[in-house]
């Protein structure tokens, strides 16, 4: 696995939060896989594939889906196809793991990128923003 300090730095995590970040990465190693892009021996980008097990059904007791999280490339390495290579690696991993589907919560600027990589808008995936929802009394 890539050095946690490098992954944290890519995410903009402050140095004083490095230990809790490393603890989080270790605690989530079974569900969160970082895929890294390197150039000249340096990590220049990363993206995470979250694997989540779904409730069993009659068709399968082993149902998993994926979610792409935190795809980032250092600004000086952008527009070189790196994020495309990260996406290709993530989608290969998703197929290897037999994930039913892969979702992504994208920023506006990246929507077209994901659409060009096979993603589509889906009418059955709904989102409730936790901050906007009322909390139970």
Q: How would you name each of these model-derived features?
A:
Residues 14-38, 48, 54-55:
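Active-site rim helix/loop that mediates acceptor-substrate recognition in acyltransferases
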Residues 32, 63, 68, 121-123:
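Short coil/loop residues immediately preceding or within conserved phosphate-binding loops
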Residues 53-68, 78:
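A conserved beta-turn-beta hairpin within the catalytic core of GNAT-like acetyltransferases
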Residues 84, 96, 100-101, 107-130:
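Conserved active-site alpha-helix within GNAT-family acetyltransferase domains
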Residues 1-9:
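A short beta-loop-alpha structural element at the N-terminal edge
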Residues 36, 42-51, 67, 72:
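Conserved beta-strand in the GNAT
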Residues 73, 79-92, 116:
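Conserved acetyl-CoA-binding loop-helix of GNAT-fold acetyltransferases
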